[in-house]
Amino acid sequence: MKRITILTTFVALLCSVQTALAWGNVGHRTVATIAEKHLTPETKAIVNKYLDGEPLAKNAATWMDRVAFWAKKHWWYIPGWEQLSYWHTMVVDEKFQPSDKRSHKGGGDLLPNLKQCVENLKNYRNLTDSAVVVNLKCVVHMVGDMHCPSHIYFTEFPDCFALPKSLDPEKKGRKARDRMIIYYNGKKMNYHHYWDQIALTELHPEFKSSHDLFSKEFDKATKGKRKKICKGTIDDWVYDIAKSCRPLYNGIKEGDHIGKEYVESTGKLAQWQCAKAGYRLAHILNECFNSK
């Protein structure tokens, strides 16, 4: 492989870097599994080459969560990539368009970095193997993240970037909408955690967290429907995602108690967001690796 021209740009981006585990491992691996089923033979061969034959769902789908600073307490933490911690959330304005607004630490930086990593992959022939692998892992994860409801920051909310000072709703402290305290089957958690860890696994507990079973259940769109989903630019997808997820915040408030009924009422959205993420990820990779 040729030595770099684009890698320097990518390294510079690493220095620009909210915490999250969007969809959890199950969701990210489900998205990756769906995507892999819709790769062209050429793209699949190239991906297999760079990942040493590993499926996208095995390590690539969750790598960005394992290198983030919130993973330091776990044995599977991979040090040296903490700058990527702020690439997990995106920010949209009142018209569901990408916003330049960021938290004081840079949180909400998913979109510009996703776009850059996609551009990098389009030039994969000019990158080192290791640079291709890193860009590939980032794209796989960020496409999953951008489709998760709790990873969208809406600037219409004055508490857009506020983080909780306490998990106790009776105590003072500004909390962002995705961090408001709710109770699922009596268990206290923030709304962000619900979407990261509960929304999918409780939708189909009989799947026992099998991403293969989830992908088979979710991947049912026709060829024509998939083509329509993938039409347009990444910014067009942002509009679709934000518009679809925004109504969630009209139906829940701080301190609400929810259960299986809520899982079922939001289940169609959760399923559809995962499926769209998988189709769009496949579309991106096919465009990057099929380019002449």
Give the positions of each predicted feature.
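Bacterial Sec-dependent N-terminal signal peptides
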Residues: M1-N25
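N-terminal, motif-rich segments that launch catalysis or mediate targeting to/interaction with membranes
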Residues: L21-M142, P149-K292
